[in-house]
């Protein structure tokens, strides 16, 4: 995956902004500082594809109290931005879709990315 399309603003919660680093990576995934080439196990949601559409449709059936914006997946794990966070640096929620009680919160995309690069999941 060399690049990916973001969900358009009309699909996002009012006031929500993607993190700047995420936007840059969407245009060039080689900006991810991989430990080894092609060793990044997460796949970014690519707006306009069936997978991204399905992730978006089912986003609120997972944890209905949260306004989730799906952005990456790795097997049964899905990463979401907190759509209620309008700071421009939203927290990230990673959920095991096979067991939604198994989920983690991260303060930012950069914090999540650091662990994703290390293949923590």
Predicted segments with their positions:
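Short, isolated positions within intrinsically disordered regulatory regions of eukaryotic proteins
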Residues: 46-48, 81, 116
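Broad, structure-driven detector of short, well-ordered beta-strand segments within folded domains
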Residues: 77-85
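Short aromatic-glycine-(Arg/Gly/Cys) micro-motifs in beta-strand/loop hairpins
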Residues: 88-96
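Compact, glycine/acidic-enriched structural inserts
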Residues: 98-121
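A short, sequence-level motif marking secondary-structure junctions
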Residues: 84-87, 109-111
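Pocket-edge structural micro-motifs
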Residues: 72-73, 83, 96
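A surface-exposed partner-binding patch
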Residues: 1-77
């Amino acid at each position: 995956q060399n690049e990916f399309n973001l969900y358009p603003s009309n699909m996002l919660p009012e006031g929500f902004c993607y993190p700047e680093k995420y936007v840059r990576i969407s245009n060039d995934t080689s900006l991810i500082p991989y430990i080894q080439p092609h060793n990044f196990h997460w796949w970014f949601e690519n707006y306009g594809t069936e997978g991204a559409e399905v992730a978006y449709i089912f986003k609120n059936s997972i944890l209905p109290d949260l306004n989730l914006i799906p952005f990456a997946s790795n097997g049964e794990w899905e990463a979401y931005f907190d759509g209620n966070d309008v700071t421009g640096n939203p927290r990230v929620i990673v959920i095991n879709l096979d067991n939604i009680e198994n989920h983690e919160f991260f303060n930012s995309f950069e914090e999540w990315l650091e662990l994703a690069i290390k293949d923590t999941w």
